[in-house]
Amino acid sequence: MLTESYQTLHRDLGIPADYASLRKLPHYAEATNLVEVGPNLVGRMQRLTPEAADKWQRMVSAAANDRIRLLIVSGFRSFDYQAELIRKKLAAGQTIGEILRVNAAPGFSQHHTGTAVDVASPGSRPLTEDFENSDAFRWLGENAGRFGFSMTYPRDNPWGFVYEPWHWSL
């Protein structure tokens, strides 16, 4: 359950009070035990839980053995970082409805758990459906399950998020 301060944050961001209940979204607590797994595409260090980090690194190595390069775009995100992503999009003129189709509200992102990764590969634009046409996506579809990862947001998912072929979680 969200604390009063996060309920206030949701109100301040314009997130409807019934957002999570209408979409049947689970609340995710912030992970506290995190380890670094390397920088993302823009050099920002990414972190995951120790278990997720181990599985991610083993998966990246296995993919590399098959000549597939998996790049991390985003791992753990705090509630505050998630709120900042939304603020930036609001400032750029997006509506909260548009934003919430792509970004979960603070408290409802799998990234809070430290067990979700947004994946990219050379030759495909990060965080776009274009990723589904990559060799990396095909490799993940065939192999990610061996490492405990699955694609969370397929087309027409029940939570109302856009199709995210780049988002994989334990």
Model-identified regions with their sequence ranges:
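Extracytoplasmic cell-surface/polysaccharide-interacting catalytic and binding patches
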Residues: M1-G75, F79-L170
